[in-house]
């Protein structure tokens, strides 16, 4: 059986930056998980004493706080600045971009449509920078019964599929006088999604490695599953089952943007140990 890695996979720029920052700072607390990968979070806690707190209210005697890659709300940032604590911002620059756009567009009188998952921490943070009105949607149908203003700005969660974002944009163009469109989908997301699409079309089994609470990993899995019925989403090599690979000729592997290489290599090693001819 051939084992092939996607052309683009794994750690993105924002995650690499955050991990490096956490390792250098040490002895700190992150507000929410730094990234969406439980194994890497455990490694940071064990080796660098970087612990994860649920929220700002959980801070007690910590001296250093790290803002997660997904960012935090504007209100939480203001609250954090009032505390006697050193702040290190690990928000991905691709996430900071829609925050800044929302703040500026609001000042100019635009209401904002955010294409994304309302419960995702990134989207919560972005929405908090809108001072007019924000509409968070996952589908154009959610906009059909809303009385839209004359001026709308549109941004996207960084991990969404571009074609779905364009469905929202095309709907708004037909419904309102002025639409300002900002492409806030991360370039790494484009590349990883294109790569897994290409690989899944020629594989008869796919393994996607990443946190099951990771939006970009789940998106990769959905693309793989669309093209390759026998696709599996795992967090560690412990979840692999030999029967997945029996009678298979081509195994494709990809990984989410928060998945470190050391986990991916463990997955590959275990698949090889199954000794599938």
UniProtKB/Swiss-Prot annotation:
Names of the cofactor(s): [4Fe-4S] cluster
Transport as UniProt keyword: no
A molecular-function term among this protein's GO annotations: 4-hydroxy-3-methylbut-2-enyl diphosphate reductase activity
Annotated transmembrane regions: none
Superkingdom as given in the UniProt entry: Bacteria
Residues engaged in binding (2E)-4-hydroxy-3-methylbut-2-enyl diphosphate: 36, 70, 120, 158, 214, 216, 258
Coiled coil feature spans: none
UniProt: [4Fe-4S] cluster binding residues: 12, 92, 186
Cofactor note: Binds 1 [4Fe-4S] cluster per subunit.
EC number, UniProt record: 1.17.7.4
Reactions accelerated catalytically: isopentenyl diphosphate + 2 oxidized [2Fe-2S]-[ferredoxin] + H2O = (2E)-4-hydroxy-3-methylbut-2-enyl diphosphate + 2 reduced [2Fe-2S]-[ferredoxin] + 2 H(+); dimethylallyl diphosphate + 2 oxidized [2Fe-2S]-[ferredoxin] + H2O = (2E)-4-hydroxy-3-methylbut-2-enyl diphosphate + 2 reduced [2Fe-2S]-[ferredoxin] + 2 H(+)
Keyword terms of this UniProt record: 4Fe-4S, Iron, Iron-sulfur, Isoprene biosynthesis, Metal-binding, Oxidoreductase
Alphabetized CDD domains for the sequence: lytB_ispH
Pathway: Isoprenoid biosynthesis; dimethylallyl diphosphate biosynthesis; dimethylallyl diphosphate from (2E)-4-hydroxy-3-methylbutenyl diphosphate: step 1/1; Isoprenoid biosynthesis; isopentenyl diphosphate biosynthesis via DXP pathway; isopentenyl diphosphate from 1-deoxy-D-xylulose 5-phosphate: step 6/6
Keyword Protein biosynthesis listed: no
Pfam family, one: LYTB
Annotated active site: 122 (proton donor)
Binding site for isopentenyl diphosphate: 36, 70, 120, 214, 216, 258
Gene Ontology terms describing biological process: dimethylallyl diphosphate biosynthetic process; isopentenyl diphosphate biosynthetic process, methylerythritol 4-phosphate pathway; terpenoid biosynthetic process
Enzyme class: oxidoreductase
Function: Catalyzes the conversion of 1-hydroxy-2-methyl-2-(E)-butenyl 4-diphosphate (HMBPP) into a mixture of isopentenyl diphosphate (IPP) and dimethylallyl diphosphate (DMAPP). Acts in the terminal step of the DOXP/MEP pathway for isoprenoid precursor biosynthesis.
HAMAP family: IspH (MF_00191)
NCBIfam families in the record: ispH_lytB (TIGR00216), PRK01045.1-1 (NF002187)
Family (UniProt): Belongs to the IspH family.
Protein name listed in UniProt: 4-hydroxy-3-methylbut-2-enyl diphosphate reductase
Organism the protein comes from: Campylobacter jejuni subsp. jejuni serotype O:23/36 (strain 81-176)
Gene name of the record: ispH
């Amino acid at each position: 059986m051939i084992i092939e890695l996607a052309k683009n996979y794994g750690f993105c720029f924002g995650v690499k930056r955050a991990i490096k920052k956490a390792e250098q700072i040490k002895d700190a607390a992150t507000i929410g998980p730094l990234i969406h990968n439980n194994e890497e979070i455990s490694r940071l806690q064990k080796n660098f004493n970087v612990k994860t707190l649920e929220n700002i209210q959980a801070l007690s005697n910590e001296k250093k706080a790290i803002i997660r890659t997904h960012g935090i709300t504007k209100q939480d940032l203001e609250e954090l600045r009032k505390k006697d604590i050193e702040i290190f911002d690990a928000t991905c620059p691709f996430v900071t971009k829609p925050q800044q756009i929302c703040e500026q567009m609001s000042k100019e009188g635009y209401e904002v449509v955010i294409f994304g998952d309302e419960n995702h921490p990134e989207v919560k943070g972005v929405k908090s920078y809108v001072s007019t009105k924000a509409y968070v949607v996952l589908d154009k149908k959610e906009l059909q019964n809303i009385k839209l203003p004359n001026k709308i700005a549109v941004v996207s969660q960084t991990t969404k599929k571009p074609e779905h974002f364009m469905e929202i944009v095309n709907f708004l163009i037909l419904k309102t006088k002025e639409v300002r469109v900002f492409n806030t989908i991360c370039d790494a997301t484009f590349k990883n999604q294109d790569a897994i699409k290409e690989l899944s079309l020629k594989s008869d089994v796919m393994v996607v490695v990443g946190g099951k609470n990771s939006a970009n990993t789940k998106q990769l899995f959905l693309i793989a599953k669309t093209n390759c019925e026998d696709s599996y989403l795992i967090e560690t090599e412990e979840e692999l089952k030999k029967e997945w690979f029996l009678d298979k000729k081509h195994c494709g592997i990809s990984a989410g943007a928060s998945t470190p290489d050391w986990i991916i290599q463990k997955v590959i090693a275990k698949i090889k140990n199954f000794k599938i001819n």
